[in-house]
Amino acid sequence: MAAAQVKNEKIGNPKSNRRRRKKRRTEDFSSDSESSSSSSSDESMDDAAEEPKPIKETKSINIDDIDIDSDKETDVNSQEKQNSLRPEPLSNETHEKLSNIKLTTSKLTSVGGSSKNSNIDINQVKKTLAKDKDQLNNEYLMLMASSFSNDLDELRKKPDFTDKSLVLLAKTLQSGSNMFDEETLNAILEQ
């Protein structure tokens, strides 16, 4: 086989060169006394072809035999940290003092008992927000219609422009307000 590789080298086949280099690398690992020059590696390759060297058998390593203590160490360290961060238990005297402290009350805490009133308030707030949003969308539509009035006039003159086209165009312009948050939309409308 070595003779076949020499013939391939003379031809200039790049695949054989790659294979030969690969083989050289594996032999370089097996012998430490060889130099890295190409002439000495060629000689060592010829020697290897003549005398097969016995491969040292590596003892198979069983993963179960490996003892890993790092998990145990981290568990111990984390328990120590948790113990140091835990507050000391409160005495009975401290519990009594804490229970005697009166909590402050406000209008919100006193109203919390009536759930019907809070539901009505929430519904009213939702309705008010919906009205304000509709009003804001309509104002945005008027702003866009005035900005694009010349373009809209040209579209109306087209033969394929119908009432449905007008409604579709108005909804499209109005839905453009959804890309802004309310503060930005208010700022645009105020300009």
Swiss-Prot record:
Residues 1-101 are annotated as: Disordered. Residues 50-59 have a biased composition (Basic and acidic residues). The keyword Cytoplasm does not apply. GO terms for cellular component: nucleolus; preribosome, large subunit precursor. Residues 76-85 have a biased composition (Polar residues). Keywords: Nucleus, Ribonucleoprotein, Ribosome biogenesis. The keyword Ribonucleoprotein applies. Residues 32-42 have a biased composition (Low complexity). Pfam families: Rsa3. GO terms for biological process: ribosomal large subunit assembly. InterPro entries: Ribosome_Assembly_3, Rsa3_C. It is found in: Nucleus, Nucleolus. Associates with nucleolar pre-ribosomal particles. Required for efficient biogenesis of the 60S ribosomal subunit. Belongs to the RSA3 family. This is Ribosome assembly protein 3. It comes from Debaryomyces hansenii (strain ATCC 36239 / CBS 767 / BCRC 21394 / JCM 1990 / NBRC 0083 / IGC 2968) (Yeast). The lineage of its organism: Eukaryota, Fungi, Dikarya, Ascomycota, Saccharomycotina. The gene is RSA3.
